[in-house]
A protein has these predicted regions:
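Extracytoplasmic cell-surface/polysaccharide-interacting catalytic and binding patches
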Residues: 1-70, 74-155
């Protein structure tokens, strides 16, 4: 995969085509809310390796980080978009790239909510995600810039 792929901006102004599927998707093999075989357990291979390192470091700190959603196809995004006004339009979700991951923790029942930022896992992630090649992509008070509401669970 060309290295520019890893720095590509994906949003309303820079969508992915419907036919885009990452070349090297693998199961991240980490604590995951989804059952084995579910496509949302997949990430692009380099992102999966980085996520594995991030999760292991978090767990060594005594925290209980879980993955909730990784890769999402254009078609799956279309299904979710049809059912909710809060879901990104198909082609504009970073999940289609296989580089994005939603995370949560058992203390908030694996919810994807702002409450995650108040957990030990959320605070650890905010501080440490960049050490593993991830960022909190949709930070608080940056909605005008990102065009997306605050999502402390999305890396």
């Amino acid at each position: 995969m060309h290295r520019d792929f890893y720095i590509r901006l994906i949003n309303r102004e820079h969508p992915l085509p419907e036919t885009f599927v990452p070349e090297h998707l693998i199961d991240i093999g980490l604590p995951f809310e989804a059952a084995p075989g579910d496509p949302k357990r997949l990430l692009e291979c380099q992102a999966a390796r980085a996520a594995s390192q991030l999760f292991h470091a978090c767990h060594r700190c005594g925290l209980n980080l879980w993955a909730v959603s990784g890769y999402r196809s254009f078609r799956r995004q279309q299904e979710l978009f049809t059912g909710s006004p809060f879901v990104a339009k198909p082609g504009t979700s970073e999940h289609q790239s296989g580089l994005a991951l939603d995370v949560s923790c058992p203390s908030i029942h694996m919810e994807l909510s702002e409450k995650f930022s108040e957990t030990g896992e959320g605070r650890w992630l905010k501080k440490n995600a960049p050490l593993y090649g991830f960022i909190l992509r949709y930070p608080k008070n940056r909605e005008e810039i990102t065009g997306v509401p605050y999502e402390p669970w999305h890396i």
